[in-house]
Curated annotation (Swiss-Prot):
UniProt KW Repressor keyword: no
Membership in a protein family: Belongs to the PDCD5 family.
Gene Ontology terms: cellular component: cytosol
Protein keywords: DNA-binding
Example of a GO MF term: DNA binding
Protein name listed in UniProt: DNA-binding protein MMP0157
Origin species: Methanococcus maripaludis (strain DSM 14266 / JCM 13030 / NBRC 101832 / S2 / LL)
């Protein structure tokens, strides 16, 4: 099970528990959810520090500022690949650039082409 699936499952469990108790507006339940989210983020950052070199982490931080959703997706894929043992550790900036290109190409929408025919 990958970290994203674990996170989604925990989030669903917490939401179901909050609804069952009628505590959706309860500040304690909200605080608990925020705390669990913070723990998840800290764990993710710890793994990324182990996987990425300093330059690669810097590049990922800049990507996160410009495109947060893409950066989140890249982080999840990096963690999955590292857990599967498919990445050299620590990941160099050059290797990271290549991975970013591949991930971007996979997620890029198909190029739309318009042809104008004149009579």
């Amino acid at each position: 099970m990958n970290p994203e699936e674990i996170r989604q499952r925990r989030l669903q469990e917490m939401q179901a528990k909050a609804q069952a108790q009628g505590a959706a507006n309860d500040p304690e339940a909200q605080r608990q959810m925020q705390e669990q989210q913070m723990q998840y983020e800290m764990q993710k950052q710890k793994i990324l520090r182990q996987i990425l070199s300093e330059e690669a982490r810097s590049r990922l931080a800049r990507i996160k500022l410009a495109k947060p959703q893409f950066a989140e997706q890249v982080e999840m894929q990096l963690i999955q690949l590292a857990q599967a043992g498919k990445l050299p550790v620590p990941l160099t900036d050059e290797y990271f650039k290549g991975l970013l290109d591949k991930i971007y190409e996979m997620n890029r929408p198909a190029k739309k082409e318009i042809t104008i025919m004149r009579k």
